[in-house]
Structure formats: structure tokens, C-alpha cells
Design a protein with these regions (language model features):
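Active-site neighborhoods and metal-handling regions in enzymes and metal-associated proteins
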Residues: 1-403
């Protein structure tokens, strides 16, 4: 793992101008809301450190690099409230940065000023996309230097996953599969007046019991007509026995996300009408996955998905004219996946090592049916690999889970 992190840093620093300093900030916990701390993903990508109020600093001069990390001093009083902070030994083991270059925040400003002056630095790189007050203060304080945004450079690197990153995504998907099976078990209990939030809680509890400390995003558990709202936020409705239940869910492992959607019959059997629509979406899901290989674009996949869905809906008399598909399909078929659920990207063709989703859907309000089927796909040298193929999506396989 540490070697992977070192390799990422080396690739990043190759793209930075000489006579430059890079400053990345991990972010700060908000004490007013007491929300969980969410580490800056670019900081984590290059350090493997998730601790708040930490700085990662790189110096590049004459094509030689120095790396520093600044952390909070360990404080026995604060430790009683919030637990132990990382020590320099911990940081060295996790990040691979030399022990002598692991410093404390009380000397951060002094050290930065020394590095700038001693090395006649001309450029400062900051992650300006993540609009932290701390970064804005640094930008203002050192405005006499050339300021560059390193967000796009890191984004381009993050798009290509190394083996360690891919394994993290696979672990997250495997845990999500366990959560999906828990959803089925919960539905099999056949309790009257079951609420969407009961399924929501069952999934979240299951994945937290299986080695992940993170839910990748707020689970979308939507029954009946609620499945027609893409980011349905309020899972409080009663689930009716003849409904379909759309479950857009994902765990994260070591901050790497999975993103899976399955649409299942509450009573264990698809009706004929539900089957008709489900089979169109499933065929589209499989068709788009077949097309994936290096050299194509996500925009191409979207065009093909929309064309396929409109043609199928015409043939099945769901619409009368092709343009009417916009009423029933109104989102993109794919996005990048990684440290963020909707991961960073620059407009480019697909390359080996990228991970994307494939998630066609149809949302027919008048029939109270919303169906989406989403898989996570790794781009390989010769094509693709579906990382979520173990999660049932064929009608017969889903119905078999209820037996």
C-alpha cells in the first residue's frame, strides 16, 4: 500500500513545475454541526492519511523532490475527549514520508516561509477546487507568488486506479452485496406496513457490520412511484406488497466507493407489466456493458443507451415517438467511481484502470414504476470487467432469492 502511495506522489510531482511548492490540506471537522469528518480526497490520495487539520507539502527544485506532512501535536487533554491523534511513527508507517519530515502544525508557517525563501520558489500549487478557508488564506497570504490549481492534475491521476485502489472498490462491492442480501431477507419477513426506512436501516446496519466504517452515500430506498425521483431523499413511505423497490446503495472501503442499484419486487415476483419494463432496462444495462472498452467515451455510451431505450420503448408501445423517451429516461448512463461516488474526471476517452458505472433506467410515473439497474465496471486492456456481477439482476435470479 505505501509503495502505491509513493508511486502516486512521484507521478504527481513529475507534472509540477520546478521551483514550486505544493500545499494540500486535509480539511477541518465542523464542531458546530458535529458531522463526521470527511477528508479531502486529493489529500488522502497522495498521503493515505485521513486525519483532520493536516497539511501535505511538496517541494520541487531542479527535478528533485522533498515531501513533508504537518499534523496536530498530540494533546493529552484533547485526547480524553476525541481520542488519540496520529504520531509521527503512525504517519510514517501509513504514508511512507520520512520521519524527519513529519512535523507539527505549530511550525507550519515558519517552515513554509523558510522553504519559499531558501529555495527561491516561484510557484505555489493549491487545491483550489476544494474551497477551504485555510487554502484561501494561504492563497491571499502568498499572492506575490504564481498560484496554480493542482486539482486537474490530481484528478487525471485519480481516474486511473492502481491495483490497491481496484481491490478497495471490489471489497466495497462485496460488502454492498451482503447489504443487498439483507434487504431481501428483510422483505421476506412479509411484515404488514413495512416502511422504506426499515429497509434503509437494515442495509446500513448490515454493511457497517462487515468491515466498513463508511456508507458511500445516503442510500436511496424508493418504493412504487417514489422510484421515479432519482435522488429520492425521504424514505418514510409504506411499502405496498405489489410495489417494486428501487435500492441505489453502496458501501465504501478505505474511502473507495461502490455504487449499485437493483430494483426488486417486494412480494418476490415481478408482475407481467413490471417484467416488460424491467427487461428493457436489463437489456440496455447489458448492451452498454458489452460496448465498454478503451478508446470510447462516456458520451458515446449515453448516446447508445438513449437510442436503445427509445427503440425498445417504441417497439413495446410505451412511447409513440422517439423523442418521448425524455419523459421516462432523464439522466446519464454512467459516471466515474473511486474515492468519490461521482468521482473526479477530465473529459477523455476510457482507459485501462478506470472504473465507471452503468445505470440505465426507466421511470414511468403513471404506472408507479421506476426501474434502474446499476453495475460497477473496470476498464481493462482488452475490454472490461463487471466488478458487481455477483449481485443478482436477472429476473429468475432475483426471484430465486425469495425462495
Amino acid at each position: 500500500m505505501v509503495n502505491n502511495i509513493k508511486t502516486r506522489r512521484a507521478k504527481f510531482l513529475e507534472k509540477i513545475n520546478n521551483n514550486s511548492i505544493v500545499i494540500l490540506f486535509s480539511g477541518k471537522h465542523n464542531p458546530n454541526t458535529n458531522d463526521d469528518f470527511f477528508v479531502n480526497r486529493n489529500f488522502f490520495y497522495l498521503s493515505n492519511i485521513s486525519q483532520e487539520n493536516s497539511y501535505l507539502v511538496f517541494l520541487k527544485k531542479n527535478n528533485k523532490f522533498e515531501e513533508y506532512i504537518f499534523i496536530d501535536k498530540q494533546d493529552k487533554k484533547l485526547e480524553k475527549w476525541f481520542g488519540k491523534k496520529l504520531s509521527s511513527i503512525d504517519v510514517n508507517a501509513i504514508s511512507g514520508i520520512k520521519k524527519n519530515n513529519i512535523l507539527t502544525n505549530d511550525i507550519f508557517e515558519k517552515k513554509i516561509n523558510f522553504l519559499l525563501q531558501e529555495n527561491k520558489i516561484e510557484n505555489i500549487y493549491l487545491d483550489l477546487h476544494n474551497n477551504e478557508n485555510v487554502i484561501n488564506e494561504i492563497k491571499t497570504k502568498y499572492s506575490n507568488y504564481k498560484i496554480f490549481d493542482c486539482y486537474a492534475i490530481i484528478s487525471e491521476l485519480r481516474m486511473i486506479k492502481d491495483d490497491c485502489e481496484i481491490n478497495n472498490v471490489i471489497k466495497a462491492i462485496n460488502i454492498t452485496n451482503l447489504g443487498f442480501k439483507r434487504i431481501i431477507r428483510e422483505l421476506k419477513l412479509k411484515k404488514n406496513n413495512k416502511k422504506e426506512f426499515e429497509i434503509f436501516n437494515a442495509f446500513n446496519n448490515e454493511i457497517l457490520n462487515h468491515g466498513t466504517h463508511e456508507i458511500a452515500f445516503k442510500s436511496i430506498i424508493a418504493s412504487g412511484i417514489n422510484a421515479c425521483y432519482l435522488h429520492y431523499p425521504t424514505p418514510y413511505a409504506t411499502i405496498l406488497k405489489n410495489d417494486l423497490l428501487l435500492c441505489d446503495v453502496g458501501s465504501a472501503f478505505n474511502h473507495y466507493a461502490s455504487d449499485i442499484t437493483r430494483t426488486i419486487p417486494v412480494n418476490g415476483k415481478f408482475s407481467q407489466q413490471q417484467k416488460k419494463i424491467y427487461e428493457i432496462v436489463l437489456a440496455c444495462n447489458k448492451k452498454i456493458i458489452e460496448l465498454i472498452k478503451p478508446g470510447i467515451t462516456i458520451e458515446y455510451l449515453q448516446k447508445k443507451a438513449k437510442s436503445f431505450l427509445s427503440q425498445q420503448c417504441l417497439e413495446k408501445k410505451i412511447i409513440k415517438k422517439k423523442f418521448e423517451i425524455n419523459k421516462y429516461y432523464y439522466h446519464n448512463v454512467s459516471h466515474y467511481l473511486g474515492l468519490d461516488v461521482h468521482d473526479v474526471c477530465v473529459k477523455t476517452k476510457l482507459k485501462p484502470g478506470m472504473v465507471i458505472t452503468v445505470e440505465p433506467g426507466l421511470y414511468i410515473k403513471e404506472k408507479k414504476i421506476g426501474i434502474r439497474i446499476e453495475d460497477d465496471i473496470l476498464i481493462t486492456k482488452n475490454g472490461h470487467k463487471c466488478l458487481s456481477s455477483m449481485i443478482a439482476k436477472e429476473i429468475k435470479d432475483i426471484e430465486k432469492l425469495y425462495l
